[in-house]
Amino acid sequence: MSSPAPSTSHNAANSTQAFSLKTRRPIDEDDLLTAEDREAKSTVEKLDCATRRRACKNCTCGRAELERQLEAGGSQVMGAMPPGGCGNCAKGDAFRCAGCPYLGMPAFDNAVDGKVKLDLTDDI
């Protein structure tokens, strides 16, 4: 007599699996955080006017003079490099240094005094 064929039940196959959707437990989100993650992060504020909209009381970067000139009705002209300038003032905020007096202003062209170049050529 021959021996019976081995049984291929699904329960036997599932018991050897490392992962099963039926036995999966939900992960507690609080267990994923460490004690360091739970601590409140504090940002250190600079004490200069690069992070503010107005010049600080003891401004040394030239922003106070620039604001006084604009309030008096003068126009903002970039003649020479600002003090401590990196040369990227005209490129926009992404390229400006923290002490740039032009922080928050749109990009401009050093050679042109506030004039917009229009391309009047036809696209056809």
From Swiss-Prot:
Binding-site list for [2Fe-2S] cluster: C49, C56, C59, C61
Cofactor(s) needed: [2Fe-2S] cluster; [4Fe-4S] cluster
GO molecular function: 2 iron, 2 sulfur cluster binding; 4 iron, 4 sulfur cluster binding; metal ion binding
UniProt entry keywords in alphabetical sequence: 2Fe-2S, 4Fe-4S, Cytoplasm, Iron, Iron-sulfur, Metal-binding, Mitochondrion
Main location group: cytoplasm
Location relative to the cell: Cytoplasm; Mitochondrion intermembrane space
Extent of motif Cx2C motif 1: 86-89
Region (Fe-S binding site B): 86-100
Region of interest (Disordered), ranges: 1-39, 40-124
Binding, [4Fe-4S] cluster: C86, C89, C97, C100
Compositionally skewed regions (Polar residues) per UniProt: 1-20
Placement of sequence motif Cx2C motif 2: 97-100
GO BP term, example: iron-sulfur cluster assembly
Annotated spans, Fe-S binding site A: 49-61
Residue stretches spanning the membrane: none
GO CC annotation, single: mitochondrial intermembrane space
Quaternary structure, from the entry: Monomer.
Free-text comment about domains: The C-terminal domain binds 2 Fe-S clusters but is otherwise mostly in an intrinsically disordered conformation. The twin Cx2C motifs are involved in the recognition by the mitochondrial MIA40-ERV1 disulfide relay system. The formation of 2 disulfide bonds in the Cx2C motifs through dithiol/disulfide exchange reactions effectively traps the protein in the mitochondrial intermembrane space.
Family: Belongs to the anamorsin family.
Biological role stated in the UniProt entry: Component of the cytosolic iron-sulfur (Fe-S) protein assembly (CIA) machinery. Required for the maturation of extramitochondrial Fe-S proteins. Part of an electron transfer chain functioning in an early step of cytosolic Fe-S biogenesis, facilitating the de novo assembly of a [4Fe-4S] cluster on the cytosolic Fe-S scaffold complex. Electrons are transferred from NADPH via a FAD- and FMN-containing diflavin oxidoreductase.
Record-given protein name: Anamorsin homolog
Gene source species: Trypanosoma brucei brucei (strain 927/4 GUTat10.1)
Organism placement in taxonomy: Eukaryota, Discoba, Euglenozoa, Kinetoplastea, Metakinetoplastina
